[in-house]
Swiss-Prot record:
Family matches, as NCBIfam families: fmt
GO CC entries: cytosol
Species the sequence originates in: Bacillus cereus (strain G9842)
Catalytic activity: L-methionyl-tRNA(fMet) + (6R)-10-formyltetrahydrofolate = N-formyl-L-methionyl-tRNA(fMet) + (6S)-5,6,7,8-tetrahydrofolate + H(+)
Enzyme class: transferase
GO molecular function: methionyl-tRNA formyltransferase activity
EC code: 2.1.2.9
Binding of (6S)-5,6,7,8-tetrahydrofolate, residues: S110, L111, L112, P113
PANTHER family: METHIONYL-TRNA FORMYLTRANSFERASE, METHIONYL-TRNA FORMYLTRANSFERASE, MITOCHONDRIAL
Pfam families: Formyl_trans_C, Formyl_trans_N
Name assigned to this protein: Methionyl-tRNA formyltransferase
Sequence similarity: Belongs to the Fmt family.
InterPro entries the record matches: Fmt, Formyl_trans_C, Formyl_trans_C_sf, Formyl_transf_N, Formyl_transf_N_sf, Formyl_transferase-like_C_sf, GART_AS, Met-tRNA-FMT_C
Superkingdom, natural source: Bacteria
């Protein structure tokens, strides 16, 4: 039986681990990030992958730094024939990459060489792409730069969010892995080098990227809101207060107005001007210190005026 070590951390990784178990491989160990404090009470919380591994009685390693010798030697001691990673969250050292008979392969949520990095799902939507996908490739020390083994395309729908696309790609990754591993073991795959001229990056989202830039086009603002839903969530400011914007709709704006200005207030939301003739009607938001709510609920208690400028004093 093929001995596999799985390395992964978030919810995205769980269906991949589950599929390895269902397909009958001997998962001899799981490597995941350490437990982290979560929420206002800072409750020490295990990763989703750790929770899944423990359900199946699989030994779990949680190195703070996998590149340290005493940590990677624990992985090598498991003597895996194959290592599979999916959103592990640390750069894996060569000592591990070179050890397994069938190598180390990674399940990545983009059509490489596009969108290398830790936030490919967010960026696929934020950049307005109509499709993305899953790539399974050999791992190298350089970020997401290994030779491609298999790929599958996944359509991005008009109202797709990072949350819904995350779920689709997670399942697509598990399914593609199920088809890829037997072909890899049988030596039936021809690795394809990535075209370095086509490389783009999707680095982890920083706080300053979450703010809505109303000077962009309506389409770009709409994609920005979708791409940061349900985490970390786009935000703007209204009357000097931070407001998270959970959802908006593209609407035509016929009269010229300064970008970021409220140009219409309707029953279900208010329309904000952008840099072109497509405005964004905010329909779901979350004022600072309050719960997420529909804009119609918000407007019952707060009455912004037409001409109010959003995005100032953030």
């Amino acid at each position: 039986m093929i001995k596999v070590v799985f390395m992964g951390t978030p919810d995205f990784s769980v269906p991949v681990l589950r599929r390895l178990i269902e397909d009958g491989y001997e998962v001899v160990g799981v490597v995941t990030q350490p437990d982290r404090p979560v929420g206002r009470k800072k409750v020490l919380t295990p990763t989703p992958v750790k929770v899944e591994a423990e359900k199946h009685g699989i030994p779990v390693l949680q190195p703070l730094k996998i590149r340290e010798k005493d940590e990677y030697e624990k992985v090598l001691a498991l003597e895996p024939d194959l290592i599979v990673t999916a959103a592990f969250g640390q750069i894996v050292p060569n000592e591990i990459l070179e050890a397994p008979k069938y190598g180390c392969i990674n399940v990545h949520a983009s059509l490489l060489p596009e969108l290398r990095g830790g936030a490919p799902i967010h960026y696929a939507i934020m950049e307005g792409k109509e499709k993305t996908g899953i790539t399974i490739m050999y791992m190298v020390e350089k970020l997401d730069a290994g030779d491609i083994l298999t790929q599958v395309e996944v359509e991005i729908e008009e109202r797709e969010t990072t949350g819904s696309l995350f779920d689709k790609l997670s399942e697509a990754g598990a399914h593609l892995l199920s088809k890829t591993v037997p072909l890899l073991i049988q030596g039936k795959l021809e690795p394809i080098k990535q075209n370095e001229e086509e490389v783009t990056f999707a680095y982890n989202i920083k706080r300053e990227q979450e703010k809505i830039d109303w000077t962009k086009t309506g389409e770009e603002v709409y994609n920005h809101i979708r791409g940061l839903n349900p985490w970390p969530v786009a935000y703007t400011t209204l009357a000097g207060q931070v407001v998270k914007v959970w959802w908006g709709e593209k609407v035509p704006v016929t009269e010229p107005a300064e970008a970021g200005t409220i140009v219409a207030i309707e029953e279900d939301g208010f329309v904000v001007a952008t840099s072109n003739e497509t405005g964004v009607k905010i329909t779901e938001l979350q004022p600072s210190g309050k719960k997420r709510m529909s804009c119609s609920q918000f407007l019952r208690g707060t009455k912004p005026e037409i001409g109010t400028k959003l995005g100032e004093n953030a």
